[in-house]
């Protein structure tokens, strides 16, 4: 059963509201309500992540696949964190560079540990971690 929408008022300084309207317009929002709801959800996900609650997300890394020691180290790290890895996708960006997208679900601290271990490997050119709600 879906929650019933509840209307409430928000008071803001004029300058802050103008900045907010500019921001949500650039982000493609049609109305303030959806933008505010998304910002609230984003903060809740951040709070869950920081407190070690269950999150889902993706770790992305770019590396040179010709450097075998990098590939082997990345695989070892992934196997060491198998309990939180849902899947991994390997993409050939060009002749030298590969993109790995690793889908994860687990405690925020474990997800952060995996992301930190992967990005610290010498030869990883770029790494990002994106987290969202696990749906619960």
Q: Residue ranges of each PLM-predicted region?
A:
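Short Lys/Arg-rich basic patches
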Residues: 1-11, 24
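Short, charge-rich, low-complexity interaction segments located
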Residues: 36, 45-52
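Conserved, well-folded catalytic cores of nucleic-acid-processing
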Residues: 42-47, 77-80
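Short, solvent-exposed charged binding patches
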Residues: 56-136
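Short amphipathic alpha-helical segments
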Residues: 8-12, 20, 30-41
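Solvent-exposed alpha-helical segments within well-ordered globular domains of core cellular machineries
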Residues: 18, 22, 34-38, 72, ...
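Alpha-helix boundary/capping and short turn/kink residues
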Residues: 26-29, 108
């Amino acid at each position: 059963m879906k929650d019933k929408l509840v209307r409430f008022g928000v008071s803001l300084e004029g300058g802050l509201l103008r900045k907010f309207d500019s921001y949500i317009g650039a982000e493609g929002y049609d109305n303030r309500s959806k933008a505010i709801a998304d910002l609230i959800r984003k903060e809740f996900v951040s709070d869950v992540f920081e407190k070690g609650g269950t999150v889902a997300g993706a770790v992305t890394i770019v590396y040179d696949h010709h450097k075998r020691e990098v590939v082997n180290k990345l695989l070892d790290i992934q196997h060491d964190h198998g309990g939180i890895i849902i899947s991994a996708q390997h993409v050939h960006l060009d002749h030298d560079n590969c993109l790995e997208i690793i889908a994860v679900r687990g405690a925020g601290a474990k997800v952060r540990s995996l992301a930190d271990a992967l990005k610290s490997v010498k030869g990883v050119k770029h790494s990002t971690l994106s987290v969202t709600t696990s749906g619960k």
